[in-house]
Amino acid sequence: MARIAGINIPDHKHAVIALTAIYGVGDTRAKSICAAAGIAEDVKVKDLDEAQIEALRTEVGKFTVEGDLRREVSMNIKRLMDLGCYRGLRHRRGLPVRGQRTKTNARTRKGPRKPIKK
């Protein structure tokens, strides 16, 4: 298994698909990384030589991925909560942040129903 950005990417998959196992790398970014590294999209990871894997590592290293990205996202949410703005309050209360209705839906964000005690 090739190790890129601290993640073991699967050997049996195509390079583009395998790169999406890294948090912060989606389909579009994986294609641009492969193009910049000069690697065809249909090549499997097990068929890459060490120089090509190193080229992928350098291209992935140009982006914010994995732990740094997770930390950045959580710090952004924490900043909103500390500011006390509307979005921060919604995060703090565990409710939808982007204006969705909450009277009937929003079960994913609110969690399972709590029975009313009589």
UniProtKB/Swiss-Prot annotation:
Residues 94-118 are annotated as: Disordered. Part of the 30S ribosomal subunit. Forms a loose heterodimer with protein S19. Forms two bridges to the 50S subunit in the 70S ribosome. This is Small ribosomal subunit protein uS13. Located at the top of the head of the 30S subunit, it contacts several helices of the 16S rRNA. In the 70S ribosome it contacts the 23S rRNA (bridge B1a) and protein L5 of the 50S subunit (bridge B1b), connecting the 2 subunits; these bridges are implicated in subunit movement. Contacts the tRNAs in the A and P-sites. Keywords: Ribonucleoprotein, Ribosomal protein, RNA-binding, rRNA-binding, tRNA-binding. Belongs to the universal ribosomal protein uS13 family. It comes from Tolumonas auensis (strain DSM 9187 / NBRC 110442 / TA 4). The gene is rpsM. GO terms for cellular component: cytosol; small ribosomal subunit. PROSITE patterns: RIBOSOMAL_S13_1 (PS00646), RIBOSOMAL_S13_2 (PS50159). The keyword tRNA-binding applies. PANTHER family: 30S RIBOSOMAL PROTEIN S13/40S RIBOSOMAL PROTEIN S18, SMALL RIBOSOMAL SUBUNIT PROTEIN US13M. One of its GO terms (molecular function) is tRNA binding. InterPro entries: Rbsml_uS13_C, Ribosomal_uS13, Ribosomal_uS13-like_H2TH, Ribosomal_uS13_bac-type, Ribosomal_uS13_CS. GO terms for biological process: translation.
